Amino acid sequence: MSDLIHDFIFQSARRNPAAEALVYGQRRLDYGTLAEAVSRVTQGLLALGLQRAERVAVYLEKNVENVAAMFGAASAGGVFVPVNPLLKPEQVGYILADCNVRVLVTSADRLRLLVPVLASCPDLRTVIVTGSADKLVPVDGLQVLAWDAAVADNGQPRAPHRVIDTDMAAILYTSGSTGKPKGVVLSHRNMVAGAASVASYLENTPSDRILAVLPLSFDYGLSQLTTAFLSGATAVLINHLFAGDILKAVVAEKITGLAAVPPLWIQVAQLAWPEDCTLRYLTNSGGAMQRPTLDALRRALPRAKPFLMYGLTEAFRSTYLPPAELDRRPDSMGKAIPNAEVMVLRPDGSECDPGEPGELVHRGALVSLGYWNDPAKTAERFKPFVSAQRGLTLTEMAVWSGDTVRKDEEGFLYFITRADEMIKTSGYRVSPSEVEEVVYAREMVGEAAAIGVNHPTLGQAIVVIAYPREGATLTDAALLAACKPHLPAYMVPQKIVIAAASLPRNPNGKIDRKLLSQQYENTFMEADQ
């Protein structure tokens, strides 16, 4: 197996160049053709003078050029920065400036929107524009090239910059649930180890066809490509608008593997799936899948094995629950993935007892290189792990997740809450997920989020925003009455809001708790005035 992420494609091309590697709409690339496309990008970037470890940002919807640009940048010895296509110009400008991007790959339409913010990106030198060359937009002070011109054969091949597995491969920006987004620096080693670990427990083979639904800027979304290319499988790209688009793609492309986040699974579970569906497995990450959704998925897709996973961008993937354990412990996030150790620690660094809440700490090959250009945040989350072996002088870095979990007597882990989402009300600390589990269990809602908002006497009050299940009629009074018997008094929501539309999402498809908190932050303060 390769030590470098781009070699996944080249090795699969050497093994079976005619095997289908990438599908996007009507475009179908075998591994030989994809390897050639990546090599052309590599040579194009080197011809532009890209130096070792310089950043190449890719701001595109999922398509062939997006994939070729990312892996081509890595192959050249650079670092790719996938930018979520849903981000607005100001957010994109922040990322380009923050990680000192040298080359930007985008479309003509997106470039037009970005022009006002590019002046604040002093390290940017070149923009490569996909699509028709006649749509090029000139930008003062920047070299603007058409894709075909940038990747054209320029004669004598240039040798890529030499990199090793501990060098940077990518910078992935978090969704910004707490303040400005942070750039998580992933090495080749991180990404290769992550792909190998996930592919091993999903048992991926060249016969798999994996649907890439999630943004490639999301570590979980990017993982669909890396596991596919490592395994010699086929990755099918989709820029979906509705859950029904996913069903159509699964059927048309005979998809065997599907990854999604909880809000999307809620919609997918409500679809009428054919009995002969080819799905072999489903994976969930980005938040806990509620029991009613899991049960509905298992009824709709009885032959597909659900893998419940937990991961943080800072360590790619951390845990998974084997499908065989679902009936015994459907609320568990499982145990550590292969080649990782996951611990539950007290603030003093000692191991928690079974049932005792503590912070999830991850060590091993998947732990990233920290946050780009942010030594304070890096020092806060990435700390030396002191080995129990007294003779070992040097320490390794582990990542402290900020997530509170517990383990049972058999070592299976259970998520409690994120430290920055904990609701502090009437002197109690309440996990939003505890309240949400009760709300979902009433089987009246399709989506729900519990948040803490400022309150003049309670410190924070619990507010639940709920969106009804399809075809259901729901009132705040009915939902409150249904939940009250199942909650201690301090956990009973002070307010329930019935949303008129699906709850807002952040760029990674998760329910946007930060936005909801902002929308309702003055609810009780205004009422008190």
Predicted regions mapped to residue ranges:
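Conserved pre-ATP/AMP-binding loop-to-beta segment of ANL
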Residues: S2, P17-A18, I128, V144, ...
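Conserved AMP-binding A3 loop
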Residues: D30-G32, R162, A169-A193
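AMP-binding/adenylate-forming catalytic core of the ANL superfamily
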Residues: L87, L104-T106, V250, L258, ...
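Conserved AMP-binding/adenylation subdomain of ANL enzymes
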Residues: V192-R209, L216-G257, L271
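AMP-binding/adenylate-forming catalytic domain of the ANL superfamily
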Residues: T130, P488-K510
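Structural core segment of the AMP-binding/adenylate-forming
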Residues: A47-L48, S75-A149, E470-A472
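Conserved AMP-binding/adenylate-forming core of the ANL superfamily
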Residues: S2-I5, F10, A18-N63, V67-F71, ...
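Gly/Ser/Thr-rich phosphate-binding loop
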Residues: L230, I255-A260, A269-R329, E341, ...
